[in-house]
Structures are given as C-alpha cells and as structure tokens.
Amino acid sequence: MWLGLRLFHRPFSSLAARGLVYEKHGEPLQVLRLKNVNITHPADNEVRVKMLAAPINPSDINMVQGTYALLPQLPAVGGNEGVGVVVEIGRHVSSMRPGDWVVPVDAGLGTWCTEAVFSEDSLVRVPSDIPVAGAATVSVNPCTAYRLLSDFETLRPGDTIIQNASNSGVGQAVIQIATSLGITTINVVRDREDLSSLIQRLRDLGADHVITEEQLRKPEMKDLFKNCPRPRLALNCVGGKSTTEMLRHLDYGGTMVTYGGMSKQPVTVPVSALIFKNVKLCGFWVTQWKKERAQTDREEIVKMIRDLCDLIRRGKLVPPPSTQRPLEDFSRALQDSQTPFLSRKQILIM
C-alpha cells in the first residue's frame, strides 16, 4: 500500500510532493492527473524516499485501467517500479539509511511521484554505482526472467530454451541472463518492417537464434536442431497459435511456463503433447512469487536483486532502450508506452 497519499488536507507535520493520481479506473490519459499530494514523516518502521526514476510498464497501465489482478485502494498513485534515494527513516528501521538507493519489491505502491513513504519491508537496497535506468527497471522484468530461468527446469550450460515475445522487457532480460549462464536461446518475434534491425539488436544482447512466428511453423525448423538440442524450457507471453507451435519443438518432458497473454488468445495444448511428450504446463506471476517469499524467505528476494544488479554492474544485463521524460511530460510518455512496435521503454524522471 502506498502510504503517503493525502489529497485534500495538509497537516502541519506533512510534506509536499507531486504524483500521478487516479481517483477512478479508466484509460490512463483520461484518469491520471499530476497533483500535489502530502506525505507524512515516516513512522517507526517506515522510510521516506525521494524517487529518482520510474518506468511505465504494461502492468502499470492495466492497474490504472482496473484490469490487473491486484488493485490498490482509490485514490492511488500509479506505478509499480522505480528507484529512489532514502531521505528519512523511522527509528526502528535497520536495513537502510539516508543516502541509500532502494527499489520497491511490492506491487501497487505508487512510484510515479516525487516522494513517498514506504514500509521498510517493501523496499530492497540496490547499489548506487549502476545506471539509474538499470536500477529503475530491475524489479519487474529482470526478476521475472531470473525466476523463469531458475525455478522450472534445472538448466545447464549448453541447454536450450525457446521463448516468444523475445523483444519484450522480459524477453530481452531472458536473453542476457541465459547468455551469462551459457544457455542457448531460440527467440521468436513477430514480423515487422524493421525486422532486420530488431534481429541485430537481439543478437547484440546475446540471442543465438531469432526467428519469426511464421518461421516457427515451417518444417525447416528441424534443421535448427541439428546445431543445438531441443529446448527443455519454453517461455510463453503470447498465447494462441504461438504457444502451440513452441510446444511442438519442446523436448520430451520439457516445461512451458506462461507468464503473459499478449494475443488475448487461450493456451491451446495438443493432447499428443501431454501424452507422448509428457510436457508440463505452468503459470508464473512475479508479484505473487514476491508476496510469498516476503513471508517465508525474504533473503531470496534480496539475493535475486543483488544478482541482477551484479549483472548490470558487469555490463551483462543492460536495460531496454528507453526514452526518459520529466514527470510533467507524463502524457507523452503514456501515449508512447502504448504505441505498437515502439520498443523504447518510457521512464519518468522525477
């Protein structure tokens, strides 16, 4: 829960901030307003954070629209991800101090603001020697990619995975993390006018094979597996026909994990894949994973963020191409974030 939202009154002890507030669900450009909000000094287990940067993700849009699986109480400040610097701590806070960089690990906290007050256990420290854009975008897509590669199959150097939506934020993170582990990636993308430049960009990130949805359906796919083993793991963010085609190429006993449904089409599984190939089907939602681990093993969240930041520091995990805009220019950023085939991440600078 975002703890600093005070829209109508400003007590003597409160502090002024600005945030993108919505009082009802709807299209972001219609319901979001940049407003002055009031935040209080932190209580014993709270932290006041000056936000530095916060991206616009599809889940942020869905939350404002009211279609996401987790919805904050209204009125609310938008944004689930970002990086900020600690400016004040409550007297019982022990894991961070003023000057530390922090990122949220809970969803629905409201990061599209200049300052906010969060509970200590909803934040994790990150190093301040990595790029702001990397820190601001580390806690959603890279965390999803990290868990997809860690939790469903025991992957070793030389193994292969296949994924669709490979140019998405998660897809790009999967490519880079897999490359750092010596895992071969087969990356499926939609055909488009700038296909050659997209293929080159993904190869620059470490992609071994980049193919289109149409190529995925062709018999010539068998030639690809002369040079690499069939994938043990398939990562699905699309659904529909793309899912069925990836399943055809999955190795015996392999696993397909669905973490999104961009096509809004159901996952269709041939009976033969279940009976004769013994494939396993799973779903994954990083928000739920974090919620469960926060209660049982918070150190696993901290380790994941630490590992990802180390990859960023070593240049093995770069954030997606981005356009950074001041908070006041949020309308342009929101519009561009929903433009098809515009692959640049929109990041709000506070």
UniProtKB/Swiss-Prot annotation:
Signal peptide: none annotated. It catalyses: a 2,3-saturated acyl-[ACP] + NADP(+) = a (2E)-enoyl-[ACP] + NADPH + H(+). Its EC number is 1.3.1.104. GO terms for molecular function: enoyl-[acyl-carrier-protein] reductase (NADPH) activity. Keywords: Developmental protein, Fatty acid biosynthesis, Fatty acid metabolism, Lipid biosynthesis, Lipid metabolism, Mitochondrion, NADP, Oxidoreductase, Transit peptide. The keyword ATP-binding does not apply. It comes from the Eukaryota. Disulfide bonds: none annotated. GO terms for cellular component: mitochondrion. The active site is at Y68 (proton donor). Expressed in the developing pronephros. GO terms for biological process: fatty acid biosynthetic process; pronephric nephron tubule development. InterPro entries: ADH-like_C, ADH-like_N, GroES-like_sf, Mito_Enoyl-ACP_Reductase, NAD(P)-bd_dom_sf, PKS_ER. It holds the Pfam family ADH_N. Its main location: mitochondrion. PANTHER family: ENOYL-[ACYL-CARRIER-PROTEIN] REDUCTASE, MITOCHONDRIAL (PTHR43981:SF9). Belongs to the zinc-containing alcohol dehydrogenase family. Quinone oxidoreductase subfamily. Homodimer. This is Enoyl-[acyl-carrier-protein] reductase, mitochondrial.
